[in-house]
């Protein structure tokens, strides 16, 4: 069958779990076609895939499956029927495969099988990047080879009340008007939609294109180790189309670099004061978002707000702090943070009134950017020890003093954040503490200066501070032929001036460009909102616009 998702009727009910070396005969009748005998290989269930072969052993259908949830399958069917169908089918397939950053083994194998089953040259390098090459369509062999690039991993964030295992479950998606969302988790449209678009082109037999080299990198979200470890000389293309921009009204031609500021140390503990009771104090409900693309929106940082409340409570009520667990991923603005605290039993009611006042102040300050902000207090088991009084004040003051948000706007590019910092993680328990910041900047010297200032802040309290994982920015080349081509094409297709821009986020183009300095690069994509948070969503109509723009670009790539 030529359709990507044929209707299949089984002659008997599939088994409840994986069964090796067992198959059943199926009968498929396509529209206007004779029925053909097919074989369903249940051994493939071990990898949560369904494979349908024809009588000569040729693969005619392959897709992820979930044997345990008809509701989930129904939702996936709804996604697969969206237009442009080639993208949504592959996005549904991809989102059925767990792919957390640094745990990409299954999605690497999935992509490797995808390329090999298409009969395309497929490579997996030592770090796990997947490269799939497809020859040009007839008549376009002389065109400049194009690298289509995206990353396989996704940010894994979920709401506190969502029971979900990113290591073993596929994303549960649903349609909400003109948007596709996930249920209580990140969606993985960043960068799953870009990967799906590349897959659709590789799998097509009716899309005109030059020689294609699809590069699927790993670990973009937590270190860009895939891009950093891609060897020079591997790629053969002269133009790179990065599909990791999150706004269809932006064509990205430059980006910021970044550096991790990793902080750690030890502290003394002291016995809990007699007559104390324990609580878990939590700041939650913040909007979060991408620590680069959303840093200018002024949203609250749970780590900073928690430190603010705790320090005020230490000074006014003499609370003890047994543990802090706040924030998470380095590239996500923290949405939640909590601390286990001790309060004198005689002061509990006064402390609750104090906390209500603090919550009211924060809700007023962040009413527009974080309308769901909440400060809660729940009873907890009394710990045996708390932080030394002197140190807890030092740690909280250091977190409060550490800059978060915009450090400097670009004096040259309107509305571009030039340098920023995200206080991403604060963890303290049992005499040890850690913190992490991600400092971004399009001017490397200024970026490193801000990181050094953060280092100095925490070294004042005796912390060990390491600046690690620095990666370069991507300098704009507005006169590059691909920029001019896509700029003119944008105006032709959409009747508006091409929105060329640089972004305050770390795209892999900066790193890849350091090994391929002559390669022309550009980045674009559909509208994705709320990336790196459970509010992530991708706009259906925007995916249609993006797909048309991508296909028209491929048709117009000039001769090499």
Where are these regions (language model features)?
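Low-acidity, Ser/Thr- and Arg-rich intrinsically disordered low-complexity segments
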Residues: 1-14, 23, 47
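Acidic/His- and Gly-rich active-site-bordering loop/insert found
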Residues: 76-178
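Zn-dependent metallopeptidase/amidohydrolase metal-coordination segment
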Residues: 84-87, 411, 418-431, 438, ...
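A short beta-alpha structural unit
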Residues: 92, 96, 340, 374-386, ...
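Active-site metal-coordination/substrate-binding segment of hydrolases
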Residues: 140-222, 227-238, 275-278, 389-392, ...
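Fold-level recognition of mixed alpha/beta catalytic cores in primary-metabolism enzymes, strongest
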Residues: 212-302, 310, 314
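His/Asp/Glu-rich mid-to-C-terminal helical/loop segments that flank catalytic regions of hydrolases
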Residues: 233, 299-316, 343, 347-348, ...
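Acidic-enriched catalytic cores of C-N bond-cleaving enzymes acting on peptides and small amides
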Residues: 254, 271-276, 295-325, 345-420, ...
């Amino acid at each position: 069958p030529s359709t990507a998702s044929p209707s299949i009727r089984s002659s008997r009910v599939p088994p409840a779990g994986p069964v090796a070396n067992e198959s059943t005969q199926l009968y498929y009748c396509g529209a206007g076609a004779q029925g053909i005998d097919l074989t369903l290989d249940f051994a493939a269930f071990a990898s949560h895939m369904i494979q349908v072969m024809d009588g000569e052993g040729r693969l005619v259908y392959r897709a992820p499956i979930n044997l345990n949830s008809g509701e989930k399958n129904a939702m996936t069917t709804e996604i697969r029927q969206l237009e442009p169908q080639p993208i949504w089918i592959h996005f549904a397939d991809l989102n059925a495969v767990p792919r957390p950053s640094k745990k990409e083994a299954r999605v690497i194998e999935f992509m490797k099988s995808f390329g090999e089953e298409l009969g395309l040259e497929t490579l997996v390098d030592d770090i796990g990047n997947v490269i799939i090459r497809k020859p040009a369509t007839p008549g376009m062999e002389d065109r400049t080879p194009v690298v289509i690039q995206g990353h396989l991993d996704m940010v894994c964030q979920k709401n506190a009340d969502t029971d979900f295992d990113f290591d073993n479950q596929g994303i549960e998606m649903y349609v909400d008007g003109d948007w596709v969302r996930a249920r209580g988790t990140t969606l993985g449209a960043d960068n799953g939609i870009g990967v799906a678009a590349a897959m659709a082109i590789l799998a097509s037999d009716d899309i005109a294109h030059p020689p294609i080299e699809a590069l699927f990198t790993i670990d973009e979200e937590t270190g860009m180790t895939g891009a950093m470890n891609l060897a020079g000389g591997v790629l053969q293309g002269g133009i790179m189309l990065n599909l990791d921009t999150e706004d269809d009204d932006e064509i990205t031609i430059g980006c910021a670099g970044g550096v991790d500021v990793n902080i750690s140390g030890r502290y003394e503990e002291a016995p809990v004061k007699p007559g104390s009771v324990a609580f878990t104090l939590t700041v939650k409900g913040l909007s979060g978002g991408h620590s680069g693309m959303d840093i200018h929106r002024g949203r609250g940082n749970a780590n900073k707000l928690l430190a603010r409340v705790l320090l005020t409570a230490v000074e006014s009520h003499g609370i003890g702090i047994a543990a802090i667990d706040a924030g998470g991923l380095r590239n996500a603005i923290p949405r939640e943070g909590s601390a286990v605290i001790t309060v004198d039993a005689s002061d509990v009611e006064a402390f609750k009134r104090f906390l209500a006042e603090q919550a009211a102040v924060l809700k007023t300050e962040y009413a527009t950017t974080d309308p769901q902000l909440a400060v809660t207090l729940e009873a907890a088991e009394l710990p045996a020890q708390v932080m030394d009084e002197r140190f807890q004040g030092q740690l909280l003051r250091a977190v409060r003093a550490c800059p978060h948000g915009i450090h400097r706007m670009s004096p040259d590019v309107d509305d571009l954040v030039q340098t920023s910092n995200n206080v991403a993680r604060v963890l303290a328990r049992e005499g040890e503490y850690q913190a992490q910041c991600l400092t971004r900047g399009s001017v490397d010297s200024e970026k490193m200066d801000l990181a050094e200032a953060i280092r100095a802040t925490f070294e004042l309290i005796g912390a060990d501070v390491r600046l690690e994982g620095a990666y370069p920015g991507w300098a704009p080349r507005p006169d590059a032929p691909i920029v001019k081509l896509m700029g003119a094409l944008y105006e032709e297709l959409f009747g508006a001036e091409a929105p060329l821009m640089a972004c305050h986020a770390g795209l892999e183009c900066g790193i890849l460009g350091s090994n391929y300095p002559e390669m022309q690069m550009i980045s674009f994509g559909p509208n994705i909102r709320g990336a790196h948070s459970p509010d992530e969503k991708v706009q259906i109509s925007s995916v249609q616009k993006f797909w048309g723009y991508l296909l028209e670009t491929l048709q117009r790539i000039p001769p090499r």
